[in-house]
Amino acid sequence: MGDPTLRTDLGRVLVTGGSGFVGANLVTTLLERGHEVRSFDRVPSPLPAHPKLTTVVGDITNGEDVATAVAGIDTIFHTAAIIDLMGGATVTEEYRQRSFSVNVEGTKNLVHAGQQAGVQRFVYTASNSVVMGGQDIVNGDETLPYTTRFNDLYTETKVVAEKFVLGQNGEQGMLTCSIRPSGIWGRGDQTMFRKVFENVLAGHVKVLVGSKNIKLDNSYVHNLIHGFILAAEHLVPGGTAPGQAYFINDGEPLNMFEFARPVVVACGRKLPNIRVSGRLVHKAMMGWQWLHFKYGIREPLVEPLAVERLYLNNYFSIAKARRDLGYEPLFTTEQAMAECLPYYTDLFDTMVAQGAQPAVAAAPKS
């Protein structure tokens, strides 16, 4: 175990996926703290011009683009990824390769380029799902083994990539660690609550899945960013973070529907109170997913992984992050909800006006 008092300045920072939800919020926070930041993404940055912000538009699977992005950088935060929440044996090879090319090969490109460019610190964005294999997890910690049961490509690619990143710790002088968020929410979220809103507007939410006593945890985006930065600051020789993975969340396990209910009510809608067996719904969605890939019918209403999170406890301890990094959530769930509720009601109203077009299933997670 390293010394938690050892910390370092981040120097010049690269944020991959800097145009996305997490990435743009991270870039903004780093700029507010006075850092020199470079944003790397496939699309231009939505952020206003800033004297300490430069942007690189490019593809993480392109070696030349990646080399340009990492040149002169001291710390890399890797948030870019594709979210494919379906998987299993029936997925097409094209579907599988799309995820692996970005989430695994793209990560390897970035690590190797960073090593060659003299980057000192590399913080990877994984997921709490890397240890979720269809079992109840209550206050799970980082000693849990990686899952070997993959029902979605996102988890599968995150397991492979995290193992690689942590295995590269210390190679050519670059220290690495990994952050495992839970469901990420807050201003800019186009995934968690957008999916809830799509189903509410489509009239699909007739019942609730699983018991009210089942809990999961979430990661408010500014709590997550706080954890990212602390981890990077502790990537120092003899420090606590090198080669380590950390669960970073809000520290307040909640039932998903009870978490979402205030938002849905604020949007002028209601959630039902009738609940049904999650295991039955999960089996139905697994069958539907198989038919989707086998015969091309429409995607399931809810991905099997999402159903598991509704009927199985899945929440994780932040004790290791507290001990090693000094992490404490900056915002309670109540405080965070008050801050971002106007954003979510505006998003809902926009979706109503636009006819609630579905989010792209494999949108980059940034």
From Swiss-Prot:
GO terms for biological process: steroid biosynthetic process. CDD domains: 3b-HSD-like_SDR_e. It is an enzyme of class 1 (oxidoreductase). Keywords: Lipid metabolism, NAD, NADP, Oxidoreductase. Its EC number is 1.1.1.51. The active site is at residue 154. GO terms for molecular function: oxidoreductase activity, acting on the CH-OH group of donors, NAD or NADP as acceptor. It comes from the Bacteria. It catalyses: testosterone + NAD(+) = androst-4-ene-3,17-dione + NADH + H(+); testosterone + NADP(+) = androst-4-ene-3,17-dione + NADPH + H(+). The keyword Secreted does not apply. Belongs to the 3-beta-HSD family. The degradation of testosterone by gut microbes containing 3beta-HSD leads to a decrease in serum and brain testosterone levels, causing depression-like behavior in male rats. The prevalence of M.neoaurum and 3beta-HSD is higher in gut microbiota of patients with depression than in those without depression, suggesting a potential causal role for gut microbes in certain types of depression. Catalyzes the degradation of testosterone into androstenedione. This is 3-beta-hydroxysteroid dehydrogenase. It comes from Mycolicibacterium neoaurum. The lineage of its organism: Bacteria, Bacillati, Actinomycetota, Actinomycetes, Mycobacteriales.
